[in-house]
Structures are given as C-alpha cells and as structure tokens.
Amino acid sequence: MPASNRATLAVIIVAKNEAADIGDCIRSVRDWADDVIVFDSGSTDGTQDICRQLGARVFETDWPGYGEQSNRALREARTDWVLSLDADERISPELRAEMIAVLESGSTHTVYSMPRSSSFCGRFMKHSGWWPDRIRRFFKREQVTFFDAPVHSHLVFDGTVGDFRAPIIHYSIPDLKAALDKANDYSTAGAAAAYAKGKRASLGSAIGHGLWAFVRTYIIQRGFLDGAEGFMLAVSNAEGTYYRYIKLMMLHRHGKQIGRASCRERV
C-alpha cells in the first residue's frame, strides 16, 4: 500500500480490447499507486472486467481522439502526480523505486521522462531508433494537459523536465501480424492527417520515402545490430511509410481512405 506521508499518484490508461496485456500493466503499479483509472472506448474482449477485478476504476466512453481521451482520464484523477501508461507497458522495479523517491522527497520538476525498452517479435531492441526512446509520462496533475495528434498524444506544460534512468518495459509488437496491423493503422491515420493539412503525394514520393525509412532504420540507426528483428523492423517501417504516402495519394484521387485507422494510443 502507498505510504501516507508521501505525495499521491494516479495511473491513467486509455484502452480498447486489451485483455491480453492490461492485467500485467495494472499489476505492475497497483501495489504502490493510489488510484488506477482506465478509460475504455468499447472493449468486447473482457478488458473492463479484468480492470475492475484488479481494483481499477473503469469508465466506458466514445472515442474522441488520443489527446481528449487522455484528458478525460486526467480529469478524473485527484492526486498530486499522474503516470500515463499504455496497456502493453510495465513499470520495472527499478523505475518504480525512482518514482517513489520523487513522491517521497518532492520535486521542482513538472514532468519526468524515462527511457522505454521496447520489444519487436520477442526481441528488446537496442538500436533501430527504438532505444532509448525517452518518453514523458510522469507529471504533476494540475500543470499538464494532453494535445491530440494522429497516432500519438503529447504533453503540454510549462516547467522543467527531470529524467529517470530506469526504463518502462514495452511489449510493443509481439509478432508479424501485429507489425502488419500497426503499419496499416498508422499509415491510415498519418495519411488522413496529411490530407487534412492539404499535403499531397505521388507514387515516386511513396517509393522514395519508403526506401529512406528502410535506410534510416537499418543503416543510420544501426538496425543491423538488432539481428533478424532489426531487418524485419526496417522493412515494416518502410512498408508503413510507403503505404502512408500511397493512401494520401488515393485520398486525393478518390476522396476516401483505404485501410483502417487505429483506435488506441501506441507511443
């Protein structure tokens, strides 16, 4: 149980159909967080039941976008600090100790960043642009809001940023099916956002940007040091980039999207 002489902490999670992951996510924080808040946009796989069984407060809502859904969860929090997690993330014991130290001793920082250790098809990547992948997820509740973006939301705040050393553990892409689904989802959302801004694309730009995505991931970001998974990730990034530009081109030609958009945050 949380100590009574420290600042309080709420964990907020935005989810849909995360039954395979969200239990372990909540278990990594429930013994030391004061509150766990889950905003669910219509799960049909038992996600909500799992969350309630583990003591989380669950709110079922529509899907207004990444930033607004996170802001809804943030508005339900009543604690001094907030930790925002995805269902496929876990807090390591080392990171937990760093966070508790801040809660116990206080801090002048508004937000803390931390590295994220992400797995691709069973391998935790050390290159390929996936490490250290610092993210800002731990913050003072009253001084931060979320800003919406096509496939990610980010924090808006005034103040300084502190750094944790230990990582969040991120079970990002478990298999090739998930990699293909993510490439499709993100390319659809990215094309829609570019279309809304009046941007255009051609077959040549799709091929060029796709090839560059592979070179950047595999060569410049040293994905070759991540073994077979590094090559697979580079191909996946190239594919997603190529299809983002192709879908943008098709939007201008036909006025309709091809593929499906993701309905959950993956950061």
Please provide the spans of the model-predicted regions.
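Catalytic metal- and UDP-sugar-binding loop of GT-A-like glycosyltransferases, i.e.
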Residues: 61, 85-87
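A conserved acidic beta->alpha catalytic loop
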Residues: 28, 32, 40-52, 86
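Catalytic-site signature of metal-activated, phosphate-bearing donor transferases
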Residues: 67-74, 80-85, 92-255
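Acidic helix N-cap motif at the loop->helix transition within catalytic regions
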Residues: 23, 45-54, 94-95
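Conserved donor nucleotide-binding strand/loop of the catalytic core
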Residues: 48-76
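N-proximal low-complexity "stem/linker" segments adjacent to membrane-targeting elements
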Residues: 1-28
